[in-house]
């Protein structure tokens, strides 16, 4: 059974890359034969979307959408690839400026990827989550900026595998910049909330080491998950009603570490194993509503190891933390301006973990604005904080600098 799980992603990427969905452009997602000879972010395939679903109304501001397939890497260093969707403005600004939006895919199937949802619309069951906040794209197109939505989970659909998302996101931005004939000086702003914020946070963390050629002038993340084990402690047992979402997080996270996952697998209860496979195999089922019906325990209770101490899982958690006191990999403090916002009563992303991360970043010289919306839950904060965050990012792209405000309240 485990062999089937691990073989699924490469199998789909070469033969049935979109969870068996019969899409006219299936071959666009096939594995390239020459990937080992490509550079990170190098484009090996591209296409123009001839139509967009009816929900997208970009008015007179959108010229076209181009999708590019590019090389990236997995957490273990092996070659990988992903897709980036590039929105070309009708009236581009004189200076090329890029805006990258990491949407919340929050799924572990390839046919849940943003690029596919943009192509097929509601034929993808992840269509609405992926496209729920494209007003930001419209806003930037109106300003003449080129916009990017990378498939930051990559072809392994590694939701919650932060390092995997960071590499795929950085290479997607790099691929878009190269497609648009940008340079190392091209100004770039990035934005993500919730699952997209986690990807954004890892893009930020890995930037200096992996992609210092990208000129980030401002980054925004809201409702950010900064520590995998701390997140599971916060939501797994006390919020058993979220068990489907939690299992998706375990499945995506462990998929980013196949060697360690293989060690953990025999200790996972059969019902959870079966549902992990179902998450991967059920065609075009991104919402996962039937997952774990009748199972009323926490997921961690169904994994019969001491997760924070068992060597394989401990390795994963210590590599999937942005907290300097827990991560075994140095956490970076980039010098470009950043903005983070969070709900004071966020039920998914624990505020105290984010505050700990922010304090550590401030103590090491970060240029970081942090805003907390007292009493607001996760989804409420997404909408309440959006305009202020985008205003900040627009100012960064306009002027290239805003002084930090080390604020912990609105």
From Swiss-Prot:
pH dependence: Optimum pH is 3.5-6. Stable from pH 3.5 to pH 8.
Transmembrane annotation, as ranges: none
Active site per database record: 194, 346, 378
Family of this protein: Belongs to the AB hydrolase superfamily. Lipase family.
Keyword terms: Glycoprotein, Hydrolase, Lipid biosynthesis, Lipid metabolism, Secreted, Signal
Glycosylated residues (UniProt): 34, 78, 122, 133, 181, 296, 325, 367, 406
InterPro entries, per database record: AB_hydrolase_fold, Lipase_secreted
Its job: Responsible for the lactonization of acidic sophorolipids (SLs). Catalyzes the intramolecular esterification (ring closure) between the carboxyl group of the hydroxy fatty acid and the hydroxyl group of sophorose C6'' of acidic SLs. Lactonizes acetylated acidic SLs, producing di-acetylated C18:2, C18:1 and C18:0 lactonic SL, and mono-acetylated C18:1 lactonic SL. Does not catalyze the reverse reaction, the hydrolysis of lactonic SL into acidic SL, nor hydrolysis of triglycerides or paranitrophenyl esters.
Keyword Methyltransferase belongs to the record: no
Protein name: Lactone esterase
Record PTM: Glycosylated.
EC number: 3.1.1.-
Biotech uses: Sophorolipids (SLs) are a family of fungal biosurfactants that have been commercialized as biodegradable detergents in ecological cleaning solutions. They naturally exist in two forms, a closed lactone and an open acidic form. Each form has distinct properties, acidic SLs have better foaming properties, while lactonic SLs are better in surface tension reduction and have antimicrobial activity.
UniProt GO molecular function: triacylglycerol lipase activity
Principal location: secreted
GO biological process, one term: lipid catabolic process
Lineage, broadest ranks: Eukaryota, Fungi, Dikarya, Ascomycota, Saccharomycotina
Class of the enzyme per the UniProt entry, highest EC level: hydrolase
Leader peptide range in chain numbering: 1-15
Temperature dependence: Optimum temperature is 20-50 degrees Celsius.
Null allele phenotype: Results in the production of exclusively acidic sophorolipids and a complete absence of any lactonic sophorolipids.
